[in-house]
Design a protein with these regions (language model features):
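Active-site rim/loop-helix segments in enzyme catalytic domains that contact anionic ligands
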Residues: 1-123, 150-154
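Metal-dependent de-N-acetylase/amidase catalytic core
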Residues: 2-25, 105-236
Length: 236
């Protein structure tokens, strides 16, 4: 376990492994978030013996893929999510029908109730979410995280957030003018774990509509290497 000194002078312990859990529920906004973002972490939880499930709040129909009809893209991304779930060996996946792109405008009580229900059904003793800044600043990501936090606070369940090291975010933002990745300095991190990305890469390949030409994703994974970092948003 590594130790880092905070600005306050206190020492912060950075764990070198994920917490041991019976059941992990990942709360995502879009199909592909579970793979592009959380895939390696979910695979590591499974290696440690956790049952891993995902609740995805939208079908991702607002993507810029350019399908002829919005419903076609929604159906395609649903199928891609199902394939990715198999690649990641997920226990349960629930795909809801909230509108993509405006998740933050949905009644928060409804989102929270859906997450709470699935957390109860799966017996989740940990919720996994994107960091509060949504990683890319995407409002849907932030809304999904907020729903997960509210559900967890009602259930008394801890919440662990996937995030990026600040150097990774800075490198991507320097390389691509259109990006606004949010990173965290070392003093904000609680877990730094080495991962095997093989299952994640297989899951990413299932999302062909989103990964066919995605240089930003490739650059992020290259910058991360075999390391994932996380932080606690809510502890038991």
């Amino acid at each position: 376990m590594a130790t880092t000194k905070l600005a306050s002078g206190n020492l912060r312990q950075i764990a070198g492994e994920l917490p041991r859990c019976r059941s992990v529920l990942a709360v995502c906004a879009h199909p592909d978030d579970e793979s592009f973002g959380l895939g390696a972490v979910l695979a590591r939880f499974e290696d440690l013996g956790s049952s891993v499930s995902v609740i995805c709040l939208t079908h991702g129909e607002a993507s810029t893929l350019g399908e002829s009809a919005e419903s076609d893209l929604a159906a395609l991304r649903q199928a891609e999510l199902a394939d990715a779930a198999k690649a990641l060996s997920l226990h349960t996946v629930r795909l809801l029908g909230y509108p993509d792109g405006t998740l933050g405008a949905e009644p928060q009580d409804r989102l929270t109730a859906d997450v709470t229900q699935m957390a109860g059904e799966t017996g989740a003793d940990l919720l996994l979410v994107f960091d509060e800044g949504g990683i890319t600043g995407h409002p849907d990501h932030m809304a999904a995280t907020a729903a997960g936090l509210l559900a967890a606070s009602r259930l008394g369940t801890p919440v662990l957030a996937w995030t990026l090291e600040q150097r990774v975010a800075d490198a991507i933002n320097s390389a691509f003018a259109s990006t606004a990745f949010k990173g965290r300095v070392t003093g904000d991190l609680d877990v730094r774990v080495e991962v095997d990305r093989q299952r994640q890469m297989r899951a990413i390949a299932c999302h062909k509509s989103q990964s066919f030409d995605n240089p930003v994703l490739r650059r992020r994974l290259a910058e991360q290497g075999t390391i994932e970092v996380l932080r606690w948003l809510l502890r038991r």
